[in-house]
Amino acid sequence: MDVFKPEKLFGIIGHPLGHTMSPLLHNWGFAEHKIPAVYMAWPTEPEKVESFMQTFRNLPISGASVTIPHKLSVMDYIDQLTERAESVGAVNTLYWDGDKIVGDNTDAAGVSEPLRPYSDQIKKALLIGAGGAARAAITGLQSLGIKEIFITNRTKSKADDLAAEFKISALDWDARGDQHLDLIVNSTSLGMSGKFEEINPMIMENQDKNTIIFDLVYNPLETVLIRKAKSKGCTVIHGIEMFVHQGLEQFRLWTGIKLDEKKARELLLEKL
C-alpha cells in the first residue's frame, strides 16, 4: 500500500479558524498536481503569534496563510515585505526566499478581480470595517480607479486613521446608510458563521438595484447582508469570489502553478 509522505508543510494561522476552507482549497491543489505537500489549520491566539513565527522559522514549514486577527501583527516577525504588501500595509501570505521570510498580500486582487466587470459604473463606494481586510479592500478599489471611497467602523478612530493613510473619507457608523452608494464592501466579521451570523453590518434603506454588494464573508455563502441585498434587487458578489482569487494567487506563489479558477470555485461551493 502506498503511504502518502508529504515533503512540504503549509498551513493557515488565525483565531478563530473554525470556518476556514483554506485547507480544502490548497490540499485539493496539491492533489490535483501530484505535489507531495500538506496544508493544515493552526489556530493561533494573538498572544502566541511571536511563538508561532519562531516555530515557522525553526521548523521546515514552506509557507503559510495569515488571516484575522494576525495580518498586521505578523509583520513584526518577517524579514522582507513585497511591494504589494507594503501598499496594503498587511500580510496574508508567508513564504521563503532563501533564508528570508517574505510577507506578501493577495487580498487586494481578491477584491479587485471580482469587481473589474463593474468598475465603470462604480463612482461612490463604502467600505465597512477597518482591519487588515479593509486595507486590502481599499488598495483593490483604488487599483480600479474608484475615486470616491468612504470607510466606516464601529470604532471611529480606526476608520479615521485608515482614511488619513489612504486619502479617503471616514463616515460615522450611524451615518453609513444615509446615502445611496454604487458599491458596499463588508470587510468585518459581521455575518460570519458563529456568534455574528445574524448581524447585518449595513442599513439598506437607501440602496436599490443599482447598488453592488460585495460581502467578504464567505461562510455562510448567503450572509444576512447578501439576503437583504437580494431582497432590494442589488447585484451581489459573494465572499467566495475574494477567497478564490486570493487563494489561487497564494498557491501560485508557493508552487508556480495557476489552479483552474472554475474548478476551485465549484469545489468550494460544494462545501457551502
Swiss-Prot record:
Active site: K71 (proton acceptor)
This protein's UniProt keywords: Amino-acid biosynthesis, Aromatic amino acid biosynthesis, NADP, Oxidoreductase
Metabolic or biological pathway, per its Swiss-Prot or TrEMBL entry: Metabolic intermediate biosynthesis; chorismate biosynthesis; chorismate from D-erythrose 4-phosphate and phosphoenolpyruvate: step 4/7
Family matches, as Pfam families: SDH_C, Shikimate_DH, Shikimate_dh_N
Binding site for shikimate: T20, M21, S22, T67, N92, D107, Y218
Binding positions (NADP(+)): E83, G129, A130, G131, G132, A133, N153, R154, T155, K156, S157, K158, L216, G239
Catalytic activity: shikimate + NADP(+) = 3-dehydroshikimate + NADPH + H(+)
GO BP of this protein: amino acid biosynthetic process; aromatic amino acid family biosynthetic process; chorismate biosynthetic process; shikimate metabolic process
SUPFAM superfamilies: Aminoacid dehydrogenase-like, N-terminal domain (SSF53223), NAD(P)-binding Rossmann-fold domains (SSF51735)
Keyword Hydrolase: no
The UniProt record lists the keyword Lipid metabolism: no
MF (Gene Ontology): NADP binding; shikimate 3-dehydrogenase (NADP+) activity
Subunit and partners: Homodimer.
Family in the record: Belongs to the shikimate dehydrogenase family.
Function: Involved in the biosynthesis of the chorismate, which leads to the biosynthesis of aromatic amino acids. Catalyzes the reversible NADPH linked reduction of 3-dehydroshikimate (DHSA) to yield shikimate (SA).
Protein name: Shikimate dehydrogenase (NADP(+))
Lineage, opening ranks: Bacteria, Pseudomonadati, Thermodesulfobacteriota, Desulfovibrionia, Desulfovibrionales
